[in-house]
């Protein structure tokens, strides 16, 4: 396992970066993954190639900005990797960098991304090749393997540091912590992706069930995290764990940020909103009933007029 970073930088990762990397990997895997029949006819010498096709590596750059000691990664774009030379296509990188600079003049290249379970020695060669663009690039690694037991995001951010190993200074990867940062537009987009309709349209009941399932999962995870936090505080009160003032301050700040559900103003606003919803439902029902009644009256008048004209002609004849 890579050691922890000592740079003191704070990293903020936006969901758009993870979506771009995941989409990039999915597209490449779909294009390169051979049919099952051709895989079955291959010999043992092609097992390594088959594994590479099943789990291809993708590469790209991450862009964003740095404010003081805070590095915020906003977006990413794809790069072309030359497996023969084990390097990135620099001309393509420079063209993409110029295009993104026109659209996002405040953003610059912070580093690069790839997919895999862990950083490798070949990754360090790519990392060093990007140091002429950014002297301290970051490496965002997404693990595409599905692990249902893992609750954290399969994303690791690495920095490079010089460490003396066996008397020789070497550059090694050190992993650093990060937080997920979102803006309103990203929250709306992620929520839209999470609630996409099925290809056949789906029924209202199916969509409602999926929505309620998502809410239930979120509440279940929130409940488990609150239980862990509560048990930790109880252990500190009993003296089983050392008292951490930083944790207590964060818990106190979290509790103060929650709205007071028992205040008079909250009850007043709740009742007002509740009555407004009832009034809207009542007006919608009245409008629907009025529309149905008008249709019945129109049909009755049409049928009565035809009967009257038919009866008149019969009497005249």
Curated annotation (Swiss-Prot):
Keywords: Cytoplasm, Developmental protein, Nucleus, Phytochrome signaling pathway, Signalosome
GO cellular component: COP9 signalosome; cytoplasm
Record-given protein name: COP9 signalosome complex subunit 6b
Keyword Lipid biosynthesis: no
Subunit text: Component of the CSN complex, probably composed of CSN1, CSN2, CSN3, CSN4, CSN5 (CSN5A or CSN5B), CSN6 (CSN6A or CSN6B), CSN7 and CSN8. Interacts with itself. In the complex, it probably interacts directly with CSN4, CSN5A or CSN5B, and CSN7. Binds to the translation initiation factors TIF3E1.
InterPro entries per the UniProt record, alphabetical: EIF3F/CSN6-like_C, JAMM/MPN+_dom, MPN, MPN_CSN6
Gene3D superfamilies attached to this UniProt entry: Cytidine Deaminase, domain 2
Additional detail: Although strongly related to metalloprotease proteins, it lacks the JAMM motif that probably constitutes the catalytic center. Its function as protease is therefore unsure.
Domain MPN intervals: 11-164
One GO biological process term: red, far-red light phototransduction
Compartmental location: Cytoplasm; Nucleus
Family: Belongs to the peptidase M67A family. CSN6 subfamily.
Record's keyword annotation contains Transferase: no
Function of the protein: Component of the COP9 signalosome complex (CSN), a complex involved in various cellular and developmental processes such as photomorphogenesis and auxin and jasmonate responses. The CSN complex is an essential regulator of the ubiquitin (Ubl) conjugation pathway by mediating the deneddylation of the cullin subunits of SCF-type E3 ligase complexes, leading to decrease the Ubl ligase activity of SCF. It is involved in repression of photomorphogenesis in darkness by regulating the activity of COP1-containing Ubl ligase complexes.
GO molecular function: metallopeptidase activity
Species for this entry: Arabidopsis thaliana
């Amino acid at each position: 396992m890579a050691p922890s970073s000592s740079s003191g930088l704070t990293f903020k990762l936006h969901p758009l970066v993870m979506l771009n990397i995941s989409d990039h990997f999915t597209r490449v895997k779909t294009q390169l993954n051979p049919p099952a029949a051709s895989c079955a006819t291959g010999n043992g010498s092609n097992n390594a190639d088959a594994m590479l096709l099943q789990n291809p590596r993708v590469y790209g750059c991450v862009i964003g900005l740095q404010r003081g000691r805070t590095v915020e990664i906003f977006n990413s774009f794809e790069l072309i990797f030359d497996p023969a030379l084990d390097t990135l296509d620099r001309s393509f990188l420079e063209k993409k960098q110029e295009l993104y600079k026109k659209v996002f003049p405040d953003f610059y290249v912070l580093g690069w991304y790839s997919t895999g379970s862990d950083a490798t020695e070949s990754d360090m060669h790519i990392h060093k090749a990007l140091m002429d663009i950014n002297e301290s690039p970051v490496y965002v690694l997404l693990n595409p393997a599905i692990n249902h037991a893992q609750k954290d995001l399969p994303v690791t951010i690495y920095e490079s540091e010089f460490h003396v190993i066996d008397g020789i200074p070497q550059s090694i990867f050190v992993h650093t912590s990060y937080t997920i940062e979102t803006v309103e537009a990203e929250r709306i987009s992620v929520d839209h992706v999470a609630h996409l309709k099925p290809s056949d349209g789906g029924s209202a009941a199916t969509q409602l069930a999926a929505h309620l399932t998502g809410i239930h999962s979120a509440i279940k995870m929130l409940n488990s995290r609150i239980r862990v936090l509560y048990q930790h505080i109880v252990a500190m009160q009993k003296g089983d764990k050392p008292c951490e003032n930083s944790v207590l301050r964060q818990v106190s700040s979290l509790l103060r940020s929650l709205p007071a559900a028992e205040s008079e103003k909250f009850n007043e606003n709740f009742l007002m909103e509740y009555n407004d919803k009832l009034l809207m439902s009542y007006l919608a029902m009245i409008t629907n009933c009025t529309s149905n009644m008008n249709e019945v009256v129109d049909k009755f008048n049409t049928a009565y007029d035809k009967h009257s004209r038919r009866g008149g002609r019969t009497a005249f004849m």
